[in-house]
């Protein structure tokens, strides 16, 4: 059973369920209940401001809206004027904050997330929403930077880690990744059928022996993986 408000938003869902309880010295007991989804409270702009945990009720009132709230504090979300979440506070009062800035030198949007343990990660994205760089700013070894490069049609072709190690990817005309060159594991290659299903995979070690991992399908459903 789903209840919606005047804007068509689902505000409560009820489902049949079973709760099993047991106490010391007694056997487990099953009870048929209705599981009531946690209620959402919206702000003036229709955004979920508070999300409550689910609760339960008896089976005889499935068609009646349950106005009660769970005793656990709700998850509280704060937004900026662009509807982006800037703060999420969980029931245990731990808070994750998100700041949005612009890096004028690279013309990228920088999204900086700070979790409840004060771990900080900054993500740089371009106008297409592609991630160009991530920086973990609070690791024990200082900043850890990973950079991403794309070709003219926005396919990921190059990843550079904080040590300068480079992983490259090659694609065919169907935008299917045919080769990954990793500095540690070497070259891994893939072949595909006309429908885009992976037919073979060959790692650097298998290539030395001229062997492949092959894949079987039944109407595009994977049915088997064959190792040499």
Regions found by a protein language model. Give the residues of each.
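Beta-strand elements of repeat-based all-beta scaffolds
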Residues: 1-228
């Amino acid at each position: 059973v789903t209840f919606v408000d005047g804007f068509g938003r689902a505000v409560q869902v009820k489902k049949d369920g079973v709760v099993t309880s047991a106490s010391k010295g007694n056997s487990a007991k099953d009870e048929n209940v209705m599981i009531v989804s946690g209620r959402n409270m919206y702000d003036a702009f229709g955004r979920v401001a508070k999300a409550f945990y689910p609760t339960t009720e008896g089976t005889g009132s499935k068609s009646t809206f349950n106005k009660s709230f769970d005793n656990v504090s709700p998850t509280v979300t704060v937004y900026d004027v662009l509807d982006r979440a800037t703060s999420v506070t969980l029931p245990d009062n731990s808070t994750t904050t998100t700041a949005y800035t612009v890096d004028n030198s690279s013309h990228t949007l920088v999204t900086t997330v700070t979790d409840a343990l004060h771990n900080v990660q900054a993500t740089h994205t371009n106008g297409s929403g592609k991630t160009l760089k991530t920086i973990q700013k609070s690791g024990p070894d200082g900043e850890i930077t990973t950079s991403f490069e794309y070709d003219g049609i926005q396919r990921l072709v190059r990843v550079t880690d904080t040590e300068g190690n480079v992983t490259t990817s090659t694609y065919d005309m169907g935008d299917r990744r045919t080769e990954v060159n990793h500095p540690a594991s070497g070259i891994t290659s893939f072949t595909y059928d006309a429908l885009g299903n992976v037919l073979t995979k060959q790692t650097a070690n298998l290539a030395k022996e001229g062997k492949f991992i092959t894949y079987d399908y039944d109407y595009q459903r994977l049915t088997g993986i064959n190792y040499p």
